[in-house]
Amino acid sequence: YGITTIQDGFLTDSLYSLLKLFAEEKLLKIDVVGYVDLENYRNIYQNHSKDYVYNNHFRLGGYKIFLDGSPQGKTAWMKEPYEHSKEKGYPVHSDEDIYELISNALEDHAQLLAHCNGDAAAEQYVKQFTRVMENHSYIDSYRPVMIHAQLVREEELTKMKPISMIPSFFVAHTYYWGDIHLANLGEERASRISPVKDAIRTGLTYTFHQDTPVLFPDVMKTI
């Protein structure tokens, strides 16, 4: 049957309205799950609770945030500098901003997806999510997801298990940008991109994805 579900990973007002229209007109041929831009469009998720379940192949799945950029563009936030550089990439948000965004998602009982490529971004997400869970005594984390998780360290993977965080790996990345990763990160770090075996050893639930339209959706290049 091929690909039967797709995800829109950053819904805005205009995109939400478009997908709703497609659903109402019964134009969607496969299931579409939308994750709302939490920072700017929280109202979409809060005001449309009826869309939490499928209606003509469309539903809302939760929220999405971005914590850094990409390793090939040297904007992924790293703990150590890129090769032959003093630059480490940069964070999108401060720790306190991330703490507040996570708190908002859990307050709305919503799953939160966070774009994290660099090890510093992964550390920030895990640390702040754990802090929110502890400070507010939340019982359910609603299965938060670390999207890409390309350079997440084993230390963070271990800390993800108690909060039921799921790494979703972009494993096809090395096929397309492996030479750039070697140049930007060096052999030691580049060889650890998408540490699926570490996730398995840690006992984590994990998934694979492709970042269409960054890549054409060809699942065989992922598995």
Language-model features, listed with the residues they occupy:
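Metal- or metallocofactor-binding catalytic centers and their adjacent structured scaffolds
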Residues: Y1
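His/Asp/Glu-enriched, well-ordered alpha-helical/loop segment
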Residues: S103-L112, A120-P144, H148-A149, E154-P162, ...
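Metal-coordinating catalytic core of metallo-dependent amide/deamination hydrolases
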Residues: T12-E123, K127, K159-I166, V171-A172, ...
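Short acidic/polar active-site loop segments enriched in Thr and Asp
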Residues: T4-T5
